[in-house]
């Protein structure tokens, strides 16, 4: 006798099916019991005609896994002719037929584990055979079945879960319960659209389980469930292979990209968007549909080849050192032969060794400039009584025979040989003094306090160790003496930049760096600086690049070693890097210098040194150089000087760190590093000719490429929220923020900021600074105290903004701040929190306001006509 044909069927009943199962096993059938077949996994039924059928009845489980979504409850052995009407949904199984064909022995065996579990801790064990034990525990077994299976389900639940049309319902139900496809119902529903283009009849009129079973049994798609299951398996395998291939492609390239965290997220997003955007997804879906998937190579992949070649080429060239400078950096220069911009014309080495300068506080500067404007308004240009005006005056040259406005500050005898003067800042007696210098013996003083070896034919690291400074621990007694230990140079945008002065801060983690590691970093910086300067003009291999390392903090006397390492800095390595621009070249303008620093930052990110030391760097891709020091009114500390603490203590002296590997004798290098003329922004290096070629633009064309491409792939937004608000509500942006948004922001602000920071927002005003930007201003000033930290200098220099982002669904208002302190990211915008206002609320409010206005006008008109006497609402 041939083996029976095994068919699985998902069943449901018109009564409590848990009770009905136990009744059938215990031969106590309910006469009103009916069992319906909802779906099955049988091949075309005419193929099994005349055979014996083993019909396995299953119920949906409550706890699902990809391999077990329904459970076997009963097994029937019956002829195929008896099974066909049930499987087609034509005839339900009655209690008598179920009892006739039921495999009771198998059913009792399937309940044995449940019986043993229920009697595990029972004091009195049930007696008798398996049937007797099941009868004894019948109520508990029924309760267990109800917890394991979905026993009370309706036709509406099946339709809403698996599909409201015939094709989707039939294919998804059979594949989900009987073929073990590891995916969700939603995925199977999407796969049916690739399997067949027809949807079949609607199931909206189906209300009973009997009708639902008849739909499945009579459907033409019931014979294609096995083919659909094979297609789904093949499609999911290919999808997984494609996704893994895309991930490998992205990850393999990502490992070579020195990106910051934000840029790394954008790159991954864009790379995936190239492969999974709408157009690509539709093309790939067409290639992997039922009729096309067999034509694809079995082991090949498709999606990685769909990456935008322009995007891939840009990423390759932009993040490769050899092609970045050549293809993505644009430099514009201009030669000026007649009266070109000139650097400082002062006396950096007076013969008598005396300093000639004017010094004063900010009030003194303002007073002198006001007096200058009052008495000499007709003799020359006027200067505003601010630091910018002071810098303009210091950098202004006058013609011979013309009155010099600097005579307001310095005697005419001093000004005979000088024109453009530097302006310094000096910290003395807890005050800031502004100093305009005409003659300065700073270099002579350095020769006295810095001891250099007579033999400079030493390796760079040995020469660095051989240098020694005479230490100074406290502020000096007079301002003239203090200028030798505390001095900052102000950047003057009116003058050309002849020496590139870089402020390098590298945040580190873990143990301090060794001397060799620091020297490797300096060599890398030197190499990239020279590489970039060659875009401006010719640069020799022995071009000087001076490094000044911030001195280490004092060692802990309790844990001091016998021999201290060269550096014990933790948290940050600070350097001042200074190099003259190519001979005859200079940079003019703040934007050009900042562009140079930005390109240098990108070059440093492409170096192997930083990637090799990434385990000792806090954040790869974080800015190394501070580009904010190249604005009017910003100053930077000079090499060899100290940082002045509160109370007058001196610390963190910037000391020379020798990095000049191209020359064996470094005597001239060390000598020039001690000359103030070589250390200032606008001073000409010793031995350099006056500049004739001026660079006025340096830009990285691909700097915002990732941001722009990300914006292009995001859903479109309304650029002008102000116009939208005014169009719907008739309110300007400031009035809308003040009346509708600020109360909600205040309730969130009370929990988002420290308690002592909240009162400053009780009285504020608003100022629109852009179409989507509103600045929050303090009632007694524009700015606020820092919301994140309590800084040493507790001045209120934090700007607060509300940034509005509008989509068709909602307006998102983000509360942001900018703090100037380095601890807060040096003026980097910080988002604190956001609230969302549904767009429907704005539209509804506008419509309500319009209806109210219309109603009031109508009532007013009616009352004037005399036809109505009701009054207007308040």
Swiss-Prot record:
Coiled coil: none annotated. InterPro entries: HSV_PRIM (IPR033685). Its EC number is 2.7.7.-. A zinc finger (CHC2-type) spans 786-824. Keywords: DNA replication, Host nucleus, Metal-binding, Transferase, Zinc, Zinc-finger. Residues 848-874 are annotated as: Disordered. The record marks 503, 505 as: Essential for primase activity. Residues 848-857 have a biased composition (Polar residues). GO terms for cellular component: host cell nucleus. One of its GO terms (biological process) is DNA replication. GO terms for molecular function: DNA-directed RNA polymerase activity; zinc ion binding. It is found in: Host nucleus. Pfam families: Herpes_UL52 (PF03121). Associates with the helicase and the primase-associated factor to form the helicase-primase factor. Essential component of the helicase/primase complex. Unwinds the DNA at the replication forks and generates single-stranded DNA for both leading and lagging strand synthesis. The primase initiates primer synthesis and thereby produces large amount of short RNA primers on the lagging strand that the polymerase elongates using dNTPs. Belongs to the herpesviridae DNA primase family. This is DNA primase. The lineage of its organism: Viruses, Duplodnaviria, Heunggongvirae, Peploviricota, Herviviricetes.
